[in-house]
Every structure is written in structure tokens, then in C-alpha cells.
Regions:
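Structured interaction and signal-relay segments at domain junctions
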Residues: 30-32, 38-105
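A short beta-strand signature within small-molecule sensing/ligand-binding domains used
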Residues: 105-117
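Short, basic amphipathic alpha-helical segments that act as recognition/interaction helices
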Residues: 10, 16-27
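Short beta-strand-centered segments at strand-helix junctions
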Residues: 1-5
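Juxtadomain coupling helices with adjacent low-complexity linkers
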Residues: 31-43, 73-82, 90, 125-158
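Short hydrophobic/glycine-rich mini-motifs in sensory/regulatory modules
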Residues: 20, 116-126
Length: 158
């Protein structure tokens, strides 16, 4: 059972079902890039041999390299939400506590998280993911996540 909290000012999509009932769904601009995000994740996986993902502010929308069953379309953790709100690229450090990607699965943790910012708003995040107690990400993964997040932000502006 999963509920997305709708805050004041969040865009909504409104649908009707076959019985005429109204369905309100939180609109995700980065979700519009779903196929594109999946291709980016696959490219990042091939380049780094790691697990790469893209999420919007609520759920993981694309993933490649593993953990698809455990994380795809699962809600992001509160800690990941805080990282996105902070608007800075995060990198897990040796000896630091692990930050889970999703509240639904504590096995997979954030190695690098780069927020996607478009027109001043946080839209989501580009992630490199590892299992708990894995070594920290390299500078290459850090810069790749940062570059892809900047690129996605620019794509959403056009």
C-alpha cells in the first residue's frame, strides 16, 4: 500500500475511470522522460558496471544493472528525499552510515545521488546504487551522475 502525499502547488493529472469516478494522480515531469531515463541508466551501467537509476521526487522510475525487482516503481526513502531537497550531489563516504534508496528495501544504498534541477525546482535524482557496506563511489561515478542530472534538467526545460 503506497500513498503519495500531495502538497500545496503540486501539479495533478485528473482521470475518470469507467464508472465515472475521478482519479487524481500526482504529475511527475521527469516521468515523461521514462524511456529516455531507462536508456540513460543502461548507458551508465555499461560505462561503470554498476547499478544506475533515475527517480522522480516520489519513486524510482528507471534502473539498470540490478535491483530492478526490489526498487523499480518503489517509493524513495525519506533520506533520499532530504538529499534531493538539499540540491547538492551526495556521495557515500567510507565509515558513514548507509542511506537506503527506498523505504521498501534497505539492502540497496545510495553511493552517489545527483539532484535533477529544472527551472529552479528539484524534479528527481540520478543515482548510483550499491549493496550495504560496499566501497564508496569513484570520482568518475560522481561526475557522471552530476553530468547526467544537469543534462536531464536542461532537457526538461526545453
Amino acid at each position: 500500500y503506497h500513498v503519495n502525499v500531495i502538497s500545496n502547488g503540486d501539479p495533478l493529472e485528473i482521470f475518470t475511470d469507467k464508472d465515472g469516478e475521478l482519479i487524481f494522480k500526482k504529475y511527475s515531469p521527469i516521468g515523461e522522460l521514462g524511456d529516455f531515463a531507462a536508456q540513460i541508466c543502461d548507458s551508465l551501467r555499461k560505462t561503470t558496471d554498476g547499478i544506475a537509476a533515475v527517480c522522480d521526487r516520489d519513486t524510482v522510475i528507471a534502473i539498470a544493472g540490478g535491483a530492478k525487482k526490489e526498487l523499480l516503481e518503489k517509493p524513495v526513502s525519506a533520506q533520499l528525499g532530504e538529499i534531493m531537497a538539499g540540491r547538492s550531489v551526495y556521495r557515500h563516504s567510507t565509515g558513514g552510515s548507509s542511506t537506503p534508496v527506498s523505504a521498501a528495501d534497505e539492502k540497496y544504498c545510495i553511493s552517489v545521488a545527483a539532484p535533477v534541477i529544472s527551472e529552479g525546482d528539484v524534479m528527481g535524482c540520478v543515482l548510483f546504487i550499491t549493496e550495504k557496506n560496499s566501497p564508496p563511489a569513484s570520482e568518475v561515478e560522481f561526475k557522471l551522475a552530476q553530468t547526467v542530472a544537469n543534462f536531464l534538467g536542461k532537457q526538461m526545460e526545453s
